[in-house]
Amino acid sequence: MAPFAPMASGILLLLWLTAPSRACTCVPPHPQTAFCNSDVVIRAKFVGTAEVNETALYQRYEIKMTKMFKGFSALRDAPDIRFIYTPAMESVCGYFHRSQNRSEEFLIAGQLSNGHLHITTCSFVAPWNSMSSAQRRGFTKTYAAGCEECTVFPCSSIPCKLQSDTHCLWTDQLLTGSDKGFQSRHLACLPREPGLCTWQSLRAQMA
């Protein structure tokens, strides 16, 4: 049996080296979609380094919340959030915070699970100062007006068409190859009349 052990180890190593890489892939959402689909949306500073839990499946970041835009009813008696949780590995969509600036504020949109706020690399997490004034207005107030009736419908290839009058066709990725185009930075999908949603300028909402 002795000669078999090195051979078996070699085979296992070869299988491991030749196994296809499984990386996390996702399409970034429009900011309005991120707001509407999240349980909690806050502005916060990352004030602590990542801590891995005892199972090594999750890690958490200590944060200092400075503003809450969504989630008051979901959090109920625990309105203050001190930690956010994420998978410990990037291959399973774990979020890794790379900024070392602990005074920088971030917009964080995530999901609640067992009273804890969870995010992944697919979540909307962005430096507050990098967002347009229209986006900040959207998260502060306007996006919520479109959550019940309207849907941002991504279009990444031709042909694509609306499936409902309550859909707004999001073409940033198609036209610019980026999710940070004009519609993302300046528009919201809002009710125009009952049963009809259209892109509307967030600048007009700011007037």
Curated annotation (Swiss-Prot):
InterPro entries: Netrin_domain, TIMP, TIMP-like_OB-fold, TIMP_C, TIMP_CS. Belongs to the protease inhibitor I35 (TIMP) family. The activity of TIMP1 is dependent on the presence of disulfide bonds. Glycans are attached at N53, N101. One of its GO terms (molecular function) is growth factor activity. This is Metalloproteinase inhibitor 1. Residues 1-23 form the signal peptide. Gene3D superfamilies: 2.40.50.120, Tissue inhibitor of metalloproteinase-1. Chain B, domain 1 (3.90.370.10). Interacts with MMP1, MMP3, MMP10 and MMP13, but has only very low affinity for MMP14. Interacts with CD63; identified in a complex with CD63 and ITGB1. The modification Phosphoserine is found at S178. The keyword Nucleus does not apply. Metalloproteinase inhibitor that functions by forming one to one complexes with target metalloproteinases, such as collagenases, and irreversibly inactivates them by binding to their catalytic zinc cofactor. Acts on MMP1, MMP2, MMP3, MMP7, MMP8, MMP9, MMP10, MMP11, MMP12, MMP13 and MMP16. Does not act on MMP14. Also functions as a growth factor that regulates cell differentiation, migration and cell death and activates cellular signaling cascades via CD63 and ITGB1. Plays a role in integrin signaling. The gene is TIMP1. It comes from Bos taurus (Bovine). Residues 24-27, 90-91 are annotated as: Involved in metalloproteinase-binding. The record marks N37 as: Involved in metalloproteinase-binding. Its main location: secreted. GO terms for cellular component: extracellular matrix; extracellular space. The lineage of its organism: Eukaryota, Metazoa, Chordata, Craniata, Vertebrata. Zn(2+) binds at C24.
